[in-house]
Amino acid sequence: MVIMSASWSSHAFQPVLERIADEIERTPGRGRPADYIPALAACDPRRFGMAVAELDGTVYGVGDWRQPFSTQSITKVFTLALDLAREGDALWEHVGREPSGNPFNSLVQLEYESGIPRNPFINAGALVVTDRLQTQTGDAAGSLLEFLRAESGNPRLTFDQDVAASEAAHGDRNAALGHFMASYGNIDNSVPVLLDQYFRQCSIEASCADLALATGFLARHGIRADGSRLLTQSQAKQVNAVMLTCGTYDAAGDFAYRVGLPGKSGVGGGIIAVVPGRCTLCVWSPGLDERGNSVAGVAALDRFTTLTGVSVF
């Protein structure tokens, strides 16, 4: 259930966003961009944008809300939804739904758990989901891009080839994860094909406005922007639940405590969040904390739920 203050109405979104942006601008210590992906390391950590999309597609924004950025792990939400729509509960035989507690690219748990990743949002789990979507579609990254273009209404969304190449050049840990899971029979496609799809997936550039709109199906309980159903209401609930418990790497507990919404972050500095039945949000600021989440992004979402009174608790 979403709890909202009695006086809250959608027309107040814009002044709330402007107040948040003003507070963020005056906040020192904004973290550091991801430096292990060279193409992201040059981002200015003080950039900031935030957008809110209502269920009918009305969007409010502030700051750099129309500036495209590297979506990175945010795309894991959409590949999860696309695969879940195709194969349903069979997916959960190959990936779990539990928080990891370890870094997002850790190999440690995989060995203890026989090649079954803890959840779909750590890198190992995301590789499994992309692998299964590749088997289903023949072009996982292309299917994802087509979906994001349709839901955002932006046909110009595209892959950033420089980011994809940068990730491939520094992707030894992901390659190790892929080969390790393949040794347990939990990867169907060749690891090089899988990695190419995964790196392209993570390289998609989109703005806060694009991603807030694209996430709308989760606030509409599985209904896409065109009115067709992607997920059952139960499946949409499942995706939101996994976002809440696993969506911000090993800081999910703190994110739930501070923000109180399902969310998914990426090392490009973006975070999406869902208010079921009401709206979706995306915030971007490239400076990250030690766990890989946007410092200003988490702070902005914290302020949003505090100022508006929205929460899933």
Swiss-Prot record:
It catalyses: L-glutamine + H2O = L-glutamate + NH4(+). Keywords: Hydrolase. Its EC number is 3.5.1.2. It holds the Pfam family Glutaminase. Substrate binds at residues 73, 123, 167, 174, 198, 249, 267. It is an enzyme of class 3 (hydrolase). One of its GO terms (molecular function) is glutaminase activity. It comes from the Bacteria. Belongs to the glutaminase family. Homotetramer. This is Glutaminase. It comes from Streptomyces avermitilis (strain ATCC 31267 / DSM 46492 / JCM 5070 / NBRC 14893 / NCIMB 12804 / NRRL 8165 / MA-4680).
